[in-house]
Design a protein with these regions (language model features):
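A ubiquitous, low-specificity "background" feature that marks scattered single residues
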Residues: 13, 17, 148, 267-269
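Catalytic alpha-helical scaffold of carbohydrate-active enzymes acting on polysaccharides/glycoconjugates
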Residues: 17-160, 166-221, 228, 232, ...
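Active-site-proximal acidic segments at structured loop/helix or strand boundaries
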Residues: 251-278
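Low-complexity, intrinsically disordered or signal/transmembrane-proximal segments
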Residues: 7, 11-13
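Charged/polar low-complexity intrinsically disordered segments
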Residues: 5-7, 19
Length: 278
C-alpha cells in the first residue's frame, strides 16, 4: 500500500532534466548475464566449465558497438552542452564484470560521464537476481556487493535502490531502509495505484523514511516498446509529443520518471529509426 506525501523529488538523489514546471528523470538499466553453454549428457563428469565465453563476448561487443559506445558518446555531448541535463544508471554487477573482461574502454567511457558531476547510479542486486523473494541475507549481500563495486569504479555511493525488474514489497522496503538507502524505484503499476498518479513521491506503511519513486510506465513504454513501431498510434514518436504529455500534467505532478533499458538506443531500436536523434 502506498500513500501520497507532500515532498517533491528535490529530496531524492536520481538526477534529472528540467523542463518548465516539470522534471523528467532519466534512468537507464543495463544488464547482461553470464550465459551458460549447451551441456550435453556425455559432458557430465568430463567438462566442468559451464560458461559460454564465446557468446558472452559476442553479445558484449555487439551491444557495445550498437548501444554503449554511441549512447555514452551522445550523453557526454549532452552533459557538456546542457548544464541542467542529468542522468542515472543501473548497471548490474555481472555486466560490469563482462565489460571489464571484454570492453574495458566502456568502463572508462562511463567514468568520463561521471566526471561531469551530473551522473548518478542506483544500487541493485549484483547478479540481477530475485533473491529478495527467497533469501533476505543473499539479497542484502548482493546489494552491499553492488554498492561497493559502484563506489570502487566510479567513486559514487548510491543512495537509491532499484530491485531486479522493479520487484517491490514491504519486506524489501524494510531491508533497504536497514541498509541505509534513502529511496527505492519501483513500477507505477496502474492496478496498484488505482486513481493515484505515478508522478508523485510516496512512502510506505512499513518504512516511512524510505521514499518510493514510481516509474511512469505509459511514457517509458512509448519509448522502449513503441518508438519505432509503424503500427503505433503515436508513430512517429517525437520529443514534442513527449514534452506535450509531460507539460500537460497537473502542476503538482512535478516529476516524471522514465526508466528503460539502455539498449533502447541502438539495439532494441536501431540507429535508422532515429532513436539517437530523439
Amino acid at each position: 500500500m502506498v500513500r501520497r506525501r507532500t515532498q517533491t523529488f528535490r529530496y531524492i538523489q536520481p538526477l534529472t532534466f528540467l523542463k518548465k514546471m516539470h522534471t523528467i528523470t532519466l534512468i537507464f538499466n543495463l544488464h547482461q548475464p553470464f550465459r551458460l553453454k549447451k551441456y550435453r549428457f556425455f559432458d557430465i563428469g568430463n567438462d566442468h566449465y559451464y560458461y559460454d565465453d564465446f557468446e558472452n563476448e559476442e553479445v558484449i561487443h555487439r551491444n557495445n558497438s550498437q548501444t554503449y559506445e554511441p549512447a555514452n558518446r551522445l550523453l557526454l555531448d549532452l552533459l557538456q552542452k546542457y548544464p541542467q541535463f542529468k542522468v542515472s544508471f543501473v548497471l548490474s554487477g555481472t555486466l560490469i564484470e563482462q565489460l571489464e573482461l571484454y570492453t574495458p574502454e566502456t568502463i572508462r567511457s562511463f567514468q568520463k560521464l561521471v566526471q561531469t558531476g551530473r551522473v548518478d547510479f542506483l544500487a541493485a542486486p549484483y547478479a540481477h537476481s530475485v533473491a529478495s523473494l527467497f533469501d533476505e541475507k543473499e539479497f542484502e549481500y548482493q546489494m552491499r556487493l553492488h554498492t561497493r563495486k559502484i563506489q570502487s569504479l566510479f567513486g559514487v555511493e548510491p543512495s537509491v535502490a532499484c530491485n531486479t525488474e522493479l520487484i517491490y514489497n514491504d519486506e524489501v522496503a524494510l531491508t533497504l531502509e536497514r541498509l541505509g538507502y534513502k529511496g527505492v524505484l519501483t513500477e507505477g503499476a496502474r492496478h496498484i495505484l488505482g486513481w493515484k498518479s505515478p508522478n508523485l513521491l510516496y512512502t510506505t506503511a512499513s518504512s516511512k523514511p524510505l521514499k518510493l519513486l514510481l516509474r511512469n510506465s505509459l511514457l517509458s513504454d512509448k519509448l522502449q516498446a513503441a518508438f519505432g513501431r509503424y503500427d503505433s498510434p503515436d508513430y512517429p514518436y517525437t520529443v514534442d509529443k513527449l514534452l506535450r504529455a509531460v507539460n500537460g500534467l497537473p502542476e503538482n505532478e512535478q516529476s516524471v520518471i522514465l526508466y528503460m533499458d539502455y539498449e533502447v538506443m541502438g539495439t532494441i531500436w536501431r540507429d535508422a529509426t532515429g532513436i539517437f536523434d530523439f
